[in-house]
């Protein structure tokens, strides 16, 4: 990455104005350096093209031109990088500066095997190009590749059992279904063990659609039935492996997964025994009616979350407030777990599953 080519790309893009102003003074050059230094630092310190893309992602909201320079460098550095040329095309299209150039980089992404068709289909950056033959051809190819990439990944499960000695051997255990937030996945690791040690099988499920990498998923609408079907399929797969108590299936979610967990409990109370909703979020409307009665529900959010998330937390408190037992907790953080989650979450799960908590 620390190549002359990468520096040349960045310099050509960011210092183009200097070529037109050859008489700039040293003071002018000093004034330009703050705009250039984040790109130079990234090019010097990034280990590979993938890290350049991550750094560009972090810059995109604050400085599109700096991000564009890094995406270009990553695209040139690694001929197998898919997202880099895609993001170059998207940023050029967003700026409306050169449709031909934007389509050229979109084609380059296609030639490298672009597969995230659903993301391309809804990407507003390309709204003015959807009529073009190039865009339509790239989209068709990406949608076809997506079906291959998604097979076996969308809805895949991850299982974490309680530690030895936590529950009686041979018991058909309750299940806590974990619904992840936007852009991550249902994979469980050792850091999640405290949740399983509350006395249930922890079942993580990948979302119903991949986004732009094989470990990045979301729960798609309209509505929540697709998520319900994915959860039921995950439970069926789990039941084929081990004995579980299907009458004691609980939901736990974060952010977008939390909204879907709350909606599933409201709409399918015969299938779910309770829910723990952490920092609900998402773009769909929260259900306004609930069939759930006699359930234990926890709603947890940070006081520093955005207004939409705060409203959604209150919406769920009201939604389950009649005929159910609702506990509420706020913490000092933002859209994240509270700092004490490793102890407070297992305690909350035990209460949700019928304990004293």
Segments (PLM) and residue ranges:
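A domain-start/cap signature at the N-terminus of enzymes
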Residues: 26-61, 65, 111-173
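C-terminal catalytic histidine-bearing segment of alpha/beta-hydrolase fold enzymes
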Residues: 130, 310-317, 321-357
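Primarily recognizes the serine-hydrolase "nucleophile elbow" in alpha/beta-hydrolase
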Residues: 247-293
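Short beta-strand/loop motif that positions the catalytic acidic residue
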Residues: 299-301
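Serine-hydrolase catalytic machinery in alpha/beta-hydrolase-like enzymes
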Residues: 174-243
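Acidic catalytic loop of the alpha/beta-hydrolase fold
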Residues: 303-309
């Amino acid at each position: 990455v620390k190549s002359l080519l990468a520096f040349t790309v960045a310099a050509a893009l960011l210092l183009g104005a200097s070529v037109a102003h050859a008489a700039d003074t040293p003071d002018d050059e000093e004034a330009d350096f703050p705009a250039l230094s984040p790109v130079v630092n990234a090019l010097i310190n990034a280990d590979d093209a993938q890290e350049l893309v991550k750094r560009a992602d972090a810059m995109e909201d604050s400085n599109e031109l700096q991000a564009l320079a890094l995406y270009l460098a990553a695209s040139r550095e690694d001929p197998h990088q898919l997202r880099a040329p895609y993001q170059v095309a998207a940023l050029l299209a967003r700026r409306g500066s050169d449709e031909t150039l934007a389509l050229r980089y979109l084609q380059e992404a296609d030639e490298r095997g672009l597969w995230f068709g659903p993301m391309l289909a809804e990407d507003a950056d390309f709204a003015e190009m959807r009529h073009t033959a190039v865009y339509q051809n790239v989209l068709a190819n990406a949608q076809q590749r997506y079906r291959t990439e998604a097979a076996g990944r969308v809805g895949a499960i991850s299982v974490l059992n309680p530690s030895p000695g936590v529950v009686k051997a041979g018991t058909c255990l309750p299940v806590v279904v974990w619904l992840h937030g936007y852009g991550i996945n249902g994979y469980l690791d050792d850091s999640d063990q405290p949740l399983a040690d509350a006395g249930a099988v922890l079942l993580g499920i990948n979302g119903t659609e991949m986004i732009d990498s094989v470990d990045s998923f979301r729960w798609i609408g309209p509505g929540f039935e697709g998520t319900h079907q994915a959860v039921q399929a995950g439970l069926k797969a789990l039941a084929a492996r081990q004995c579980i108590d299907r009458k004691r299936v609980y939901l736990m979610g974060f952010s977008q997964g939390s909204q879907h967990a709350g909606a599933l409990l409201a709409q399918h109370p015969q299938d779910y025994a309770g829910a723990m909703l952490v920092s609900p979020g998402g773009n769909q409307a929260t259900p306004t009616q609930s069939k759930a009665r006699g359930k234990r529900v926890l709603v947890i959010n940070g006081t520093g979350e955005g207004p939409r998330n705060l409203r959604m937390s209150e919406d769920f408190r009201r939604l389950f407030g009649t005929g159910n037992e609702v506990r509420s907790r706020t913490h000092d953080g933002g859209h994240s777990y509270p700092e004490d989650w490793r102890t407070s979450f297992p305690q909350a799960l035990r209460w949700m599953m019928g304990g004293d908590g």
